[in-house]
Amino acid sequence: MNILQHFQLEGSVAIVTGSGRGIGRAIALAYAEAGADVVCSARSLADVQAVAEQIRAMGRRALAITCDVLDPEQRQALVRQSHEQMGRVTHLVNNAGGGGPNDPLSMSPGEFEQILNFNVSTAYALCQLCVPLMREAGGGNILNISSVAARYSQRHFSAYGTAKAALSHLTRLLAQDFAPHVRVNAVAPGPTLTEALNGVMPAAMRQAMEANTPLKRLGTPQDIAAAALYLASPASAWVTGKIIDVDGGADATVWPA
């Protein structure tokens, strides 16, 4: 087989959460370009409809489904509709999640738990729903979107960093539980120039962060999507339970002090 054929996803059906914008959108488009049919989900229907239209323009099938991953009924509906309308589910990308800086002396335990639920519990629940369908289809692939915040020691990220560290270790543990027919890996992005980050980052902060990054630039959604495609494709057929850092070579936080 030609080496480039190992990066193809033809015959696959992928659910990508949080795929209306940013990293999720880039992953959905990359999977489609590699031959997958894609279910795009997010809280904003307009956003995922636009992404689905781009995927259909590539000649692939696409669904746009509204889903708040914190809502159990919406999670179940997402997976059920994907299976019913696409015929199978082979790939899951747990991209929906997030969280900002926090003050550990003022954030309530309930607020802390919300960050854990948003980033970890929702991914766990979607894996439970999708893995039986993947096994039914003959095998599958799960990709979790973690963060370098999972391994950096930095101020004001005790909630988000803890949640992403939990997601990274959940990735390793589920890889053992779901082997040999379902692989589970994660990408841990560094600072990535999504619409959300661009909207709040002053030029001086960006310059400082780029100066602190060995490769002297911040990431793009396409950087993350390229790593995601590797982990989703047969090119990584002997890889499971691994976290790939895509961070420009940084070994510590590049955020200005």
What annotation goes with each model-predicted range?
Residues D103-L116, L197, M209:
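Substrate-binding pocket helix/loop in short-chain dehydrogenase/reductase
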Residues V93, A179-R183, V239-G241:
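Short, small/polar-rich loop/turn modules that mediate ligand/substrate recognition or access, typified
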Residues S147:
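Residue(s) in the substrate-gating loop at a strand-loop-helix junction
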Residues C127, A163, T171:
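Active-site helix of classical SDR
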Residues N2-Q5, Y152, L229, T240-A257:
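Short C-terminal tail/terminal secondary-structure segment
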Residues P132, A175-P180, A237:
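Alpha-helical segment proximal to the catalytic Tyr-Lys
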Residues V13, G20-G22:
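Conserved glycine-rich cofactor-binding loop
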